[in-house]
Amino acid sequence: MSFISNPNIHFYLLAYFIGGIPFGYLLSRFFYNINLQEVGSGSIGATNVLRALKERDPKKAKMMAALTMLLDALKGALVILVAKMAGMSVETQWAIAVLAVVGHCFSPYLKLEGGKGVATGLGVMAVMLPLEAAIGLVVWLVVGKTLKISSLSSLLGLGALLISSFLIHPEIPEIGTHAPLLIIAFVIFYKHIPNLVRLFQGKEGRVV
């Protein structure tokens, strides 16, 4: 089978380019003429959407942030679901999951800049490891509600998802390794390094 006609390659490209769609950037630009890369943390995710819009349109800021999060999660989940319906192997589905998150974090439409990967990561995990994704989501919600620090709640939720995955599945079904999950976790952690620096300096902003 040639490179061009290989359906796996088609899905890998689809995952990266759909994962790279910067919904937060597009929504803020289209409705408010705000360039998310020039405000707040410069990220294109829901948290920065909320921060950027709070002063401009406080009544709709949370709604736009929630919409951004939903779209970012769906773009990761939908590509995998289509791959499942097309009969792609579990190995291919995991590769798609990784590439969707990489696409979001290093978007081809924004000169390889992007978001933190949390919502897209949650979307792909909801399909691949739904129980672990639910555990991570609960931790993220509880910590976020209590401490109101988005980066910390995201990383603790990620940690909970990782730990629970090893406890529930010592070997990930059908692939026998946690490697794709660890790659996704590494990418998300890497994108949060500036947040961790600010956190240790006491400069990380809270989200109200």
Swiss-Prot record:
It catalyses: an acyl phosphate + sn-glycerol 3-phosphate = a 1-acyl-sn-glycero-3-phosphate + phosphate. It comes from Wolinella succinogenes (strain ATCC 29543 / DSM 1740 / CCUG 13145 / JCM 31913 / LMG 7466 / NCTC 11488 / FDC 602W). PANTHER family: GLYCEROL-3-PHOSPHATE ACYLTRANSFERASE-RELATED, INNER MEMBRANE PROTEIN YGIH. It is a multi-pass membrane protein. HAMAP family: PlsY. GO terms for molecular function: acyl-phosphate glycerol-3-phosphate acyltransferase activity. Probably interacts with PlsX. This is Glycerol-3-phosphate acyltransferase. Catalyzes the transfer of an acyl group from acyl-phosphate (acyl-PO(4)) to glycerol-3-phosphate (G3P) to form lysophosphatidic acid (LPA). This enzyme utilizes acyl-phosphate as fatty acyl donor, but not acyl-CoA or acyl-ACP. Belongs to the PlsY family. It is found in: Cell inner membrane. Its EC number is 2.3.1.275. It is an enzyme of class 2 (transferase). The chain crosses the membrane at residues 7-27, 63-83, 86-106, 123-143, 149-169, 170-190. Keywords: Cell inner membrane, Cell membrane, Lipid biosynthesis, Lipid metabolism, Membrane, Phospholipid biosynthesis, Phospholipid metabolism, Transferase, Transmembrane, Transmembrane helix. NCBIfam families: glycerol-3-phosphate 1-O-acyltransferase PlsY (TIGR00023). One of its GO terms (cellular component) is plasma membrane. It comes from the Bacteria. The keyword Nucleus does not apply. InterPro entries: G3P_acylTferase_PlsY. One of its GO terms (biological process) is phospholipid biosynthetic process. Pathway: Lipid metabolism; phospholipid metabolism.
